[in-house]
Amino acid sequence: MSYRKLGRTTSQRKALLRDLATDLIINERIETTEARAKELRSVMEKMITLGKRGDLHARRQAAAFIRKEVANSETGQDALQKLFSDIAPRYQDRQGGYTRIMKLGPRRGDGAPMVIIELV
């Protein structure tokens, strides 16, 4: 299985992808580097597929990965609840391809290629 190391140790890489996945669930659109977005795409495919399954085991598997952050302060809904109640039903008839990556220009400081990744 090949993956991008993203210049980090295994635990740092997992933490980065957890943070990015949680942010993408909450905001539904984030700006990041191209390499991070391409790795995040496969993680989000798995999370949304778990959300579509919707059983207790899938919810626990997703809860083990997604951070416990508040997605909507008015309703008190957290990221996991948003994934299972709002995002997953949207893609019930779609077999994969839940995210879109749009290229931006290079980052000003170091020239890293930047993209916007969003839920379709």
From Swiss-Prot:
Source taxon at top rank: Bacteria
Annotated TM spans: none
A cellular-component GO term for this protein: cytosolic large ribosomal subunit
Keywords of this entry: Ribonucleoprotein, Ribosomal protein
PROSITE patterns, A to Z: RIBOSOMAL_L17
Family annotation (InterPro entries): Ribosomal_bL17, Ribosomal_bL17_CS, Ribosomal_bL17_sf
Keyword Calcium in record: no
Annotated family: Belongs to the bacterial ribosomal protein bL17 family.
PANTHER family assigned: LARGE RIBOSOMAL SUBUNIT PROTEIN BL17M (PTHR14413:SF16), RIBOSOMAL PROTEIN L17 (PTHR14413)
Subunit composition and interactions: Part of the 50S ribosomal subunit. Contacts protein L32.
Protein name, UniProt field: Large ribosomal subunit protein bL17
Lineage summary: Bacteria, Bacillati, Bacillota, Bacilli, Bacillales
Gene name of the record: rplQ
